[in-house]
């Protein structure tokens, strides 16, 4: 991954006029307890401060470069209030699907937050719930098979499009292709 500063320097050098930040938004502990694939809730203020510093740098390096603060927001059943809270202040919400199935107790707290260490994981190996693009754990593919993963992915993707979150844009409608031959 790269920092905001690195991205601004590269964008300025390439003559870009607009750059949108879309790091992965905070997730519930039931989906990613250690916070490995996201900006954790505890890191959101530092993340925003780093973005604001990048805006200042962009104004020095390339005054015509406009930066937009955003997040890639995973959609999962019941996520709306959490996504709205965690993405507050974002100018862009990029909707995405990476998780299929029941996300578990999403209201038990944000990943990495104190007191969430004992929140049960929702992606148990025998379940049909979990990440579809995590190559270290392909249990969803093995348990459901390629066709069912695709079917559920399309259903979830369409649900995200119809969500009251009103995403600005939806990402990778073809994400299952990444592992379609693995399941």
Please name every model-derived segment.
Residues 88-90, 94-183:
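Domain-core and long-helix interface of multi-subunit machines
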């Amino acid at each position: 991954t790269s920092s905001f500063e690195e991205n601004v320097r590269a964008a300025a050098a390439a003559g870009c006029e607009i750059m949108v930040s879309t790091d992965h938004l905070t997730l519930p502990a039931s989906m990613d307890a250690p916070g490995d694939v996201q900006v954790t809730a505890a890191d959101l203020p530092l993340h925003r401060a780093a973005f604001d510093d990048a805006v200042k740098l962009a104004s020095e390096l390339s005054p015509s470069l406009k930066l937009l603060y955003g997040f890639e927001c995973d959609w999962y059943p019941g996520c709306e209030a959490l996504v709205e809270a965690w993405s507050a202040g974002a100018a862009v919400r990029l909707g995405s699907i990476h998780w299929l199935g029941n996300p578990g107790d999403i209201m038990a707290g944000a990943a990495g937050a104190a007191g969430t260490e004992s929140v049960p994981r929702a992606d148990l190996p025998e379940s049909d719930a979990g990440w579809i693009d995590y190559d270290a754990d392909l249990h969803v593919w093995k348990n459901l098979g390629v066709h069912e993963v695709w079917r559920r992915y399309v259903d979830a993707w369409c649900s995200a499009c119809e969500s009251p979150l009103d995403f600005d844009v939806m990402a990778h409608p073809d994400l299952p292709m990444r592992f379609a031959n693995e399941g």
